[in-house]
Swiss-Prot record:
It comes from the Bacteria. Residues 667-702 form the UVR domain. SMART domains: DEXDc, HELICc. The UvrABC repair system catalyzes the recognition and processing of DNA lesions. A damage recognition complex composed of 2 UvrA and 2 UvrB subunits scans DNA for abnormalities. Upon binding of the UvrA(2)B(2) complex to a putative damaged site, the DNA wraps around one UvrB monomer. DNA wrap is dependent on ATP binding by UvrB and probably causes local melting of the DNA helix, facilitating insertion of UvrB beta-hairpin between the DNA strands. Then UvrB probes one DNA strand for the presence of a lesion. Its main location: cytoplasm. This is UvrABC system protein B. The gene is uvrB. Disulfide bonds: none annotated. The lineage of its organism: Bacteria, Bacillati, Actinomycetota, Actinomycetes, Kitasatosporales. Belongs to the UvrB family. Pfam families: Helicase_C, ResIII, UVR, UvrB, UvrB_inter. It comes from Streptomyces coelicolor (strain ATCC BAA-471 / A3(2) / M145). Residues 625-655 are annotated as: Disordered.
Length: 712
């Protein structure tokens, strides 16, 4: 149910800012996609070959259509990459990022066979939580919004109407009782803290109130004269520098699950009623242990709700807080969008099945908890949308993939093709070779490539084979590395950077050489056991793997097989079809394929040096903190789209004295940003990591100046 709001959304045009113009197949694809959507087609498919610029095409399409857009990606890392690309292409519009805010999540579960109860355990990433709030804030206040999300967007997200109703509007000249205003901030889950000013808190100094919204990087200052708001301003939370003077601002709740006293009391009464009914049912079935367990757990939760307004696992009572009937769908991010929003599903061959699978996986775990007295039946209604419910809530959809699935193709009136690359690069030549003598042949091909300073990817079916092959190559003196699931994320980044930099020549892997790897130096992809049918050698998997050689002018794919399977035939035919079309286009237009030159980010080494320097500057306390913190979820930007980030804010305001920032607070910020810098690099977010590195360097310089001046 979409919320009814008095807020008038600001209207600014979507505008792509890029030094490049659409080229290759892009102009035709953009025009055709826009035409089909404007003609009212509900489902449109863009079949875009690897490296043809599908993200840029999507941005130009949004510019033509001028509609709020939700872009769904299959995982957090791809969502972060997309958000970065859209932010670069549409710098003047709100590009938001909405994924699960858990760095670590162990769901509550019960295993009847061993009578094992597993408690819920999780770690929340505060920056990702801020970005989630920023997304809903943008959707409610403006129309030029693109939200890049994972399947997290189909999970329950409080009650949008309650979220809007409890928002606090502030306008210069309006009258507000000061104490009543403070009570309203507390009601929407902001905490008063006059000592440590952090996100989600407010502080009071005489007639001045400062509040730090959970979705912003900048704080808000409210200056009052009696009961009248005299001035509103946006300021930097650390330095106190005024960034802008405002006439009107909105403060949204600090939680999407905000509930007023009346709603809370009604929910508690409903929970008590459901508990009584369920206990009677269990006792009739002779399940006395389950009844006792449920009584103890639920009465404790009810008492916690009455005393502090929340409890552990409060999301399991969301049906009662939302006032929904059993079985009805939850409110999700989709309900925050205006009615005419556009949905874009990236890598649709992966994402569409993922959306459909979410509900059953969640429900089977919760049914066990309900059956054994750990949860009330209403816990089953704290769930993601079912596929049918998801379809009811979306309007027009554009599916993007190099290998669209049967579902997308069956719903559209033929796919819009984007086969020609702006660089003129063509799909690699596919060569099928017999398995007899395959390793000797592969060694010969590797030697040919290394002589030309090119790189090779080798994909095997099993971990054992990959290990044995790597050992054999080492014996032959080939510079080789092995990429597998046991390699941690940061080391994986280093391996890919080292391959591109030429520190070694061959990378052996299993299923890690498909979507998301951008390696222009790779001229040969070798697929061993290509004729062994299964998930890793399906038509879709083979096309995706072939795409890894599509960024090199002399790219080739060698499939080692004794027979041509239907999957191989499909992949080879599709690759040849695209290749013929690309070669014909280049010939007709006099295009000379240009090698893709991408800067090799040596950010990993820089981060390691920055880490050592930070440790020397901050001492042993930093080392302990560093060891205690895990890698965070990928985040697409250091600062909010609307504010330009903390660094930009400082750049816009006048310089302040070094003494304006306490040394302890500065050291804490250096520590926090260094952790985020490492996390960004671990998720291949090199631009963010570089920006964070610059920020850390600036702060360390400031701290050293303070120490030299005897101020720290």
């Amino acid at each position: 149910m979409r919320p009814v709001s008095q807020i008038e959304r600001t209207v600014a045009p979507f505008e792509v800012v890029s030094p490049y113009q659409p080229s290759g197949d892009q102009p035709t694809a953009i025009a055709e996609l826009a035409r089909r959507v404007q003609a009212g087609e509900k489902d449109v498919v863009l079949l875009g070959a690897t490296g043809t610029g599908k993200s840029a095409t999507t941005a130009w399409m949004i510019e033509k259509l001028q509609r709020p857009t939700l872009v769904m990606a299959p995982n957090k890392t791809l969502a972060a990459q997309l958000a970065n690309e859209f932010r670069e292409l549409l710098p003047n519009n709100a590009v938001e990022y909405f994924v699960s805010y858990y760095d670590y999540y162990q769901p509550e579960a019960y295993v009847p066979q061993s009578d094992t109860y597993i408690e819920k355990d999780s770690s929340i990433n505060e920056e990702v939580e801020r970005l989630r709030h920023s997304a809903t804030n943008s959707l409610l206040t403006r129309r030029d919004v693109i939200v890049v999300a994972s399947v997290s967007c189909i999970y329950g997200l409080g009650t949008p109407q309650e979220y809007v109703d409890r928002m606090v509007p502030l306008r210069v000249g309006e009258e507000h009782d000061r104490d009543e205003l403070l009570r309203r901030f507390v009601d929407i889950q902001y905490t008063r803290n006059d000592m440590a000013f952090a996100r989600g808190t407010f502080r009071v100094r005489g007639d001045t109130i400062e509040i730090f919204p959970v979705y912003e990087e900048l704080a808000v200052r409210i200056e009052m004269f009696g009961d009248e708001i005299e001035a509103l301003s946006t300021l930097h939370p650390v330095t106190g520098e005024i960034i802008s003077e405002d006439q009107q601002l909105y403060v949204f709740p600090a939680s999407h699950y905000v509930a007023g006293p009346e709603r809370l009391e009604r929910a508690v009464n409903d929970i008590e009623k459901e508990l009584a009914e369920r206990l009677t049912e269990l006792e009739k079935q002779g399940k006395l242990l389950e009844a006792q367990r449920l009584r103890m757990r639920t009465t404790y939760d009810i008492e916690m709700l009455r005393q502090i307004g929340s409890c552990s696992g409060v999301e399991n009572y969301s049906m009662h807080f939302d006032g929904r009937s059993p079985g009805s769908p939850p409110n999700t991010l989709l309900d925050y969008f205006p009615d005419d929003f556009l949905l874009v599903i990236d890598e649709s061959h992966v994402t569409v099945p993922q959306i459909g699978a979410m509900y059953e996986g969640d429900a089977s775990r919760k049914r066990t908890l309900v059956d054994h007295g750990f949860r009330l039946p209403s816990a089953l209604d704290n769930r993601p949308l079912k596929w049918e419910e998801f379809q009811e809530r979306i309007g027009q959809t554009v599916y993007l993939s190099a290998t669209p699935g049967a579902y997308e193709l069956s719903r559209s009136d033929g796919a819009v093709e984007q086969i020609i690359r702006p660089t003129g690069l063509v799909d690699p030549e596919v060569v099928v070779k017999p398995t007899e003598g395959q390793i000797d042949d592969l060694v010969h091909e590797i030697r040919r490539r290394t002589e030309k300073d090119e790189r090779v990817l080798v994909t095997t079916l099993t971990k054992k084979m990959a290990e044995d092959l790597t050992d054999y190559f080492v014996e032959l003196g080939i510079q080789v590395r092995y990429l597998h699931s046991d390699v941690d994320t940061l080391r994986r980044v280093e391996l890919l950077r080292e391959l591109r930099a030429g520190e070694y020549d061959v990378l052996v892997g299993i299923n890690l050489l498909r979507e998301g790897l951008d390696l222009p130096e790779v001229s040969l992809v070798a697929i061993l056991d290509a004729d062994k049918e299964g998930f890793l050698r399906s038509g879709t998997s083979l096309i995706q793997t072939i795409g890894r050689a599509a960024r090199n002018v002399s790219g080739q794919v060698h499939m080692y097989a004794d027979k041509i399977t239907p999957a191989m035939e499909k992949a080879i035919d599709e690759t040849n079809r695209r290749r013929e079309k690309q070669v014909a286009f280049n010939k007709a237009n006099g295009v000379d394929p240009q090698p893709l030159r991408k800067k090799i980010n040596d950010i990993v080494a820089q981060i390691a040096r920055e880490d050592v320097d930070t440790e020397q500057l901050l001492g042993s306390g930093y080392r302990q903190t560093k060891e205690g913190k895990g890698a965070k979820a990928p985040v697409p930007a250091l600062g909010g789209q609307k504010t330009g980030g903390a660094k930009a804010a400082r750049g816009r305001a006048k310089e302040t004295a070094v003494t304006d920032r306490p040394a302890a607070e500065l050291a804490e910020q250096i520590e926090d940003l260094t952790t985020r810098m490492r996390a960004a690099a671990a998720d291949l977010q090199f631009e963010i990591a570089a920006r964070l590195r610059d920020e850390v360097s600036e702060m360390k310089k400031e701290l050293r100046q303070m120490r030299e001046a005897g101020l720290a």
